[in-house]
């Protein structure tokens, strides 16, 4: 049974749209936990477009589940992670022009530099996950980097047309099995919604799904606690048959 990590970046997006103080993502994280979130995920971007350093400091002091820090593989971010001591760091690719993360890390091309950062964080007691596309080459490179976890990028599945979703789901299933055969633990996320999450949640071996935008969008209608509860039910009790095919 997969657990649910709730990404609260989009709450901070609303605040930053007006450059004001509300909504504050810190108390919203508490509401997400009260709704059943097993962890809180935030992405501290280099341009600070949504989550701010102040948010991260306060979240570390207040989150009672698990705090997963998504960040670019840079010296600045490694220094912040070493200071904050999140429960996990997920290294993600980052481009200033993108609206959201557009793909997985090219671990195979950056294996040398990533290994140094992975070692530095894990020696300090912080488990490291690498956000990767569901491709064997990247999984093998992730293993060689010394990371203990991968987070599979589910964007291709989430964005696929009806006819292609079964193919993308098979890729995720195969990638999960391959990662586990290497000794890696597996999370997944990106683009998952109330409509498409169950098939991914049913994949044996995926331990946690990180989901944000759809929960925050749903919360406008039903409130954050209820939106998290609804997603938690789908993640923990998925239909075993996909809605397509």
UniProtKB/Swiss-Prot annotation:
Signal sequence region: none
Positions with a binding annotation for 3-amino-2-oxopropyl phosphate: 7, 18, 191, 212-213
UniProt EC number: 2.6.99.2
Keyword list, A-Z: Cytoplasm, Pyridoxine biosynthesis, Transferase
Biological process according to GO: pyridoxine biosynthetic process
Residues at the catalytic site: 43, 70, 190
Catalytic activity: 3-amino-2-oxopropyl phosphate + 1-deoxy-D-xylulose 5-phosphate = pyridoxine 5'-phosphate + phosphate + 2 H2O + H(+)
Localization terms from the record: Cytoplasm
Site entry: Transition state stabilizer: 151
Record-level Gene Ontology MF annotations: pyridoxine 5'-phosphate synthase activity
Cellular-component GO terms for this entry: cytosol
Binding residues annotated for 1-deoxy-D-xylulose 5-phosphate, in chain numbering: 9-10, 45, 50, 100
One Pfam family cited in the UniProt record for this chain: PdxJ
Gene3D superfamilies documented for this protein: Aldolase class I
Highest taxon, organism lineage: Bacteria
UniProt cross-references to PANTHER family, sorted A to Z: PYRIDOXINE 5'-PHOSPHATE SYNTHASE (PTHR30456:SF0)
Similarity comment: Belongs to the PNP synthase family.
Quaternary structure and partners: Homooctamer; tetramer of dimers.
Chain's role: Catalyzes the complicated ring closure reaction between the two acyclic compounds 1-deoxy-D-xylulose-5-phosphate (DXP) and 3-amino-2-oxopropyl phosphate (1-amino-acetone-3-phosphate or AAP) to form pyridoxine 5'-phosphate (PNP) and inorganic phosphate.
Protein name: Pyridoxine 5'-phosphate synthase
């Amino acid at each position: 049974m997969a657990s649910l990590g709730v990404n609260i970046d989009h709450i901070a997006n609303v605040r930053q749209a007006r450059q004001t103080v509300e909504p504050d993502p810190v108390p919203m994280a508490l509401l997400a936990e009260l709704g059943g979130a097993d962890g809180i995920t935030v992405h501290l971007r280099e341009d600070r477009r949504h989550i701010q350093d102040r948010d991260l400091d306060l979240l570390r002091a207040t989150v009672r589940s698990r705090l997963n820090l998504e960040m670019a593989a840079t010296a600045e971010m490694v220094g912040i992670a070493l200071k904050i001591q999140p429960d996990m760091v997920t290294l993600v690719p980052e481009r200033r022009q993108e609206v959201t993360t557009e793909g997985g890390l090219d671990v195979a091309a950056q294996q040398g530099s990533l290994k140094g950062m992975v070692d530095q964080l894990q020696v300090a007691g912080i488990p490291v996950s690498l956000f990767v596309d569901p491709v064997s080459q990247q999984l093998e490179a992730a293993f060689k980097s010394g990371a203990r976890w991968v987070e599979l990028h589910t964007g291709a599945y989430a964005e696929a047309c009806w006819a292609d979703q079964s193919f993308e789901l098979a890729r995720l299933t195969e990638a999960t099995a391959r990662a586990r055969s290497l000794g890696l633990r597996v999370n997944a996320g990106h683009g998952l919604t109330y409509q498409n999450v169950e098939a991914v949640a049913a994949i044996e071996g995926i331990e946690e799904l990180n989901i944000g935008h759809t929960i925050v969008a749903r919360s406008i209608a039903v409130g954050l606690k209820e939106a998290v509860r609804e997603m938690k039910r789908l993640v923990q009790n998925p239909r075993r048959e996909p809605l397509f095919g």
